[in-house]
């Protein structure tokens, strides 16, 4: 049987993956309408804690935190103590040279994105990553947006652009690789 989708990348591992959190900010969170805020925050924090437990490089950004959208949500800051957030003004996080440099400095070729909003903050840099030769994944349950149409069309656009859409837990469990690992309880 021949697969209908020839895009079947090599598995994510602790040596090839990094996580990029884009604009998980207080002001943007208040407009989320496609997901329960409590569940969305749970998924964002779970992704952050799993990334830390697996020793994955993490890049975090905010946009216009002083003028438009406020700081990163406190729950994400607490899950990533000591993490610096790159505050920028560009719509596409990748267009800020500091963000691009931070992503490239991870040395990883598989990038997991989570952001508010899904169709802009997570999607734009993920699509750019694909164009730049990276494999990009969007953890759709760690992303939110402002209505269901934006969510549905955003996921379609991501898939059409070569970005893999999947849930955060599946990504981190794939990276974990072995339930006998002492890191397993922190990942699950």
For every predicted segment, state its role:
Residues 1-90, 105, 135-138, 152-159, ...:
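Active-site acidic carboxylates
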Residues 71, 98, 124, 149-153:
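Generic recognition of short, well-ordered alpha-helical segments
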Residues 30-32, 122-124, 148:
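Active-site-proximal flexible loops/turns
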Residues 112-115, 134-148:
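A short glycine-rich beta-strand->turn/loop micro-motif centered on a GG-aromatic cluster
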Residues 88-131:
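Internal catalytic-core helix/loop-beta-alpha segment
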Residues 92-93, 119-120, 143-148, 172-173:
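Short gly/pro/ser/thr-enriched loop/turn and capping motifs at secondary-structure boundaries
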